[in-house]
């Protein structure tokens, strides 16, 4: 770096060369050089930090712990930063997730940028990163506060995606409510059901998943702000944190609260852990649904081919005309990633040694990743797979007629063992069930036709569609 391209600033360790036009200061520059690898700190975290710092500045002024002119200068600088688009905002926030596990460097990145910009906009006030922007706070309570805020924000985006998929499935459920097909257990033929009934199971699973998320989400409304370094609240002005919670609630539209045990808030992240457990459950259900759809669509000539899937793109670079269930594959890969993220979060949440957990940055990065990929793949699955999905009724009828497990309908009339022998005979001799049943002498043709009612076997009249 040539002389004209950098400036020298000092922190408590010593002088640091910093790019001349950078708004950040020495601690950010040290981190930039010390931790250059991995994904960048999510901008959701940065924006949450900015909202938190603004709320803190306003609150400190209101309780008399910050001069009004300094507080207003900090607020003004933050408003300028919040107005930037993501590309421009990123220029001043270059740090990575893999840094100190407390997120200290990212907290200081925000403090330094806000202070330097405030001094540019309001010369002469001498605003300092630690003494003014970080007043009454520490990385130990600000970073976990932003973690919960952005987690709630991410869930707010995921929930509509789940509802949208439910809506698309309900449309298909109603359309195919009385379309009878072969049921399958252990990947083997089983008794009939309707495709609508099968879809109702998917819908119910997603409704349960949505309710788990919604019921657990309020645990994330408990904010650690005010705990400062170890949970005692040292250096936080009385009344400041309650005001911060109120201001953040207005910004995000959720009832955040600070009346919680701060020692828990700094050393534990069980709220994020348990909520991510619900995301893992959603991912597991999505894997099952996507797997079912792609298997039922297998073929078209040498598979089940009960379902016709939309042709969204060419499926092969060598096999002409091939159509693949790509949206389902994206869902299953996303689910695999969520399972891995859950393991990361579970382990990282256990690392709250003494008064602070130092795996914070990787916990929230994994949580946000899960929310993002679930939101995207669920939306794509709804719009580009389920919406255009149709049933191959002719193929369903063919497989149903060839199934041996419809013999179950005869069991109440002729007994389990006699019915089993009919199925075994049909399979061994390659005949239809009806032929084997009549040959057994246990059933007349009239009885067979009466009892072998596929629709009646589904108990459709006792089933209720999911809405």
Predicted regions: what they are:
Residues 1-467:
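Conserved, well-structured ligand/cofactor-binding cores
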């Amino acid at each position: 770096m040539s002389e004209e391209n950098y400036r020298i600033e000092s922190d408590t360790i010593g002088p640091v060369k910093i790019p001349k036009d950078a708004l950040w200061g020495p601690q950010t520059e040290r981190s930039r050089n010390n931790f250059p690898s991995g994904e960048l700190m999510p901008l959701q975290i940065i924006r949450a930090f900015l909202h938190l710092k603004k709320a803190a500045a306003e609150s400190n002024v209101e309780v008399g712990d910050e001069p009004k002119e300094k507080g207003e200068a900090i607020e003004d600088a933050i408003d300028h930063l919040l107005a930037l688009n993501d590309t421009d905002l990123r220029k001043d926030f270059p740090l990575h997730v893999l840094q100190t596990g407390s997120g200290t460097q990212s907290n200081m990145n925000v403090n330094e940028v806000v202070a330097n910009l405030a001094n540019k906009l309001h010369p002469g006030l001498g605003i300092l990163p630690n003494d003014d922007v970080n007043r009454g706070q520490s990385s130990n309570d600000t970073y976990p506060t932003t973690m919960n805020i952005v987690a709630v924000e991410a869930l707010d985006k995921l929930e509509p995606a789940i509802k949208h998929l439910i809506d698309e499935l309900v449309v298909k459920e109603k359309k195919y409510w009385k379309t009878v097909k072969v049921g399958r257990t252990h990947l083997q033929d089983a008794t009939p059901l309707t495709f609508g009934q099968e879809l109702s199971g998917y819908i119910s699973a997603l409704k349960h998943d949505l309710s788990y998320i919604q019921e657990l989400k309020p645990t994330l409304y408990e904010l650690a702000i005010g705990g400062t370094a170890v949970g005692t609240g040292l250096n936080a002005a009385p009344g400041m944190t309650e005001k911060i919670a109120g201001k953040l609630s207005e910004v995000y539209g959720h009832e955040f609260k600070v009346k919680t045990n701060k020692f828990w808030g700094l050393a534990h992240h069980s709220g994020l852990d348990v909520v991510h457990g619900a995301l893992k459950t959603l991912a597991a259900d999505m894997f099952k649904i996507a797997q079912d759809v792609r298997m039922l669509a297998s073929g078209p000539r040498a598979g089940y081919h009960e379902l016709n899937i939309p042709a969204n793109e060419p499926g092969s670079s060598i096999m002409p005309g091939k159509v693949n269930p790509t949206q389902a594959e994206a869902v299953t890969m996303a689910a695999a990633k969520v399972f891995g993220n859950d393991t990361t979060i579970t382990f990282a949440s256990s690392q709250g040694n003494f008064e602070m957990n130092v795996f914070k940055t990787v916990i929230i990065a994994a949580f946000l990743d899960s929310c993002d990929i679930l939101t995207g793949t669920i939306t794509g699955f709804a719009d580009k797979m389920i919406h255009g999905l149709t049933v191959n009724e002719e193929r369903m009828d063919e497989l149903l007629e060839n199934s041996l497990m419809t013999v179950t309908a005869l069991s109440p009339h002729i007994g389990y063992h006699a019915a089993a022998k009919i199925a075994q005979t049909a399979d061994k001799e390659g005949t239809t069930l009806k032929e084997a049943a009549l040959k057994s002498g246990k059933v007349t043709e009239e009885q067979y036709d009466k009892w072998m009612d596929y629709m009646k076997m589904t108990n459709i009249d006792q089933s209720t569609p999911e809405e």
